[in-house]
Amino acid sequence: MKDITLPPPTSASCLTGAISVNTEAVLSPMQHTSALHVRDFASLCSQNLKANVLLNSDDHEVPIHQKNPAAIMQNIDSNIKQMATDWGMSIEEVEVIIGREKGIVEPSCGVTANAIMKLFLDKDGFSYCFENEQTLSLEQLQERLSCMPECKSFVLRVNDGALGHAYIVDIPKGENSCRPAFLYQSDLGEGVTRKLRFEDWMTHKALTPILLDDICNYFSCMSQNKTDLEQIATLFDIDGNVKMLRKENIQYQKHDNFSFQLFEYDTDNIEKNIEIIKSLCS
């Protein structure tokens, strides 16, 4: 088994801005089934009210495939009616205020990240809950990645203090010397990067693989307070457009404030969950 080497990058590697996607070494966009399942989930959540409430549900003690979207919707409607009564407003006015116009709610980055983790990991007897899971530092993550089995797939949840952002890195099985990865995210546009719908990212960019080394290089650069806007734009902007970044919003005092959660996953489990969700939301 080959190990992936993750030494601290030199200042030159941090400042070149080069994110080198070797298309011969990584998966082509349509070969990674997990990415396709996440794309289908994002599309469903943008169009179907039941799926959207599953995406935004904060009851993480219940596995995503065991939730009752109809019951959740009924509770939401009851709460909105009560708010309308308490505030002396119409239901429509309340929905505008809380961002629930037409029922579809665009999730924050953290909500999206949590929902994707549940899609990957939830099964009978286990329900992913961000607050309850082990958190790794960058050094601990690097150690784990250095001995990651090539025959297994992993999902990584990232809390990125510098960007004020949370996102998912999907690491399918593959040779560690050129291990592919896929980045999943949404963004309300309140930080460094612009507003981004979950479905738009999954449709237009998420199926294009990056190298795991490249995202790890980003972690290392930011932890050394070496900010490369081209690197950030290449990874996180839907068009790779540096001009769309708001550099003034980078939290430099939090440049090393990364936390990670890393889990092995089974692609069959994702497929099972997405099929159940589609059935629940039909």
UniProtKB/Swiss-Prot annotation:
The active site is at C109, H165, Q185. Changing V111A: No effect; does not affect ability to mediate deamidation of host NEDD8. One of its GO terms (molecular function) is toxin activity. It is an enzyme of class 3 (hydrolase). GO terms for cellular component: extracellular region; host cell nucleus. Keywords: Host nucleus, Hydrolase, Plasmid, Secreted, Toxin, Virulence. One of its GO terms (biological process) is symbiont-mediated perturbation of host cell cycle progression. The keyword Metal-binding does not apply. The keyword Hydrolase applies. Its EC number is 3.5.1.44. It catalyses: L-glutaminyl-[protein] + H2O = L-glutamyl-[protein] + NH4(+). It is found in: Secreted; Host nucleus. InterPro entries: Cif (IPR032278). Residues 1-16 are annotated as: Translocation domain (TD). It comes from the Bacteria. Changing K152A: No effect; does not affect ability to mediate deamidation of host NEDD8. It holds the Pfam family CIF. Its main location: secreted. The translocation domain (TD) is necessary and sufficient to mediate translocation into the host cells. Belongs to the Cif family. Protein-glutamine deamidase effector that inhibits the host cell cycle and other key cellular processes such as the actin network and programmed-cell death. Acts by mediating the side chain deamidation of 'Gln-40' of host NEDD8, converting it to glutamate, thereby abolishing the activity of cullin-RING-based E3 ubiquitin-protein ligase complexes (CRL complexes). Inactivation of CRL complexes prevents ubiquitination and subsequent degradation of the cyclin-dependent kinase inhibitors CDKN1A/p21 and CDKN1B/p27, leading to G1 and G2 cell cycle arrests in host cells. This is Protein-glutamine deamidase Cif. The lineage of its organism: Bacteria, Pseudomonadati, Pseudomonadota, Gammaproteobacteria, Enterobacterales. The gene is cif.
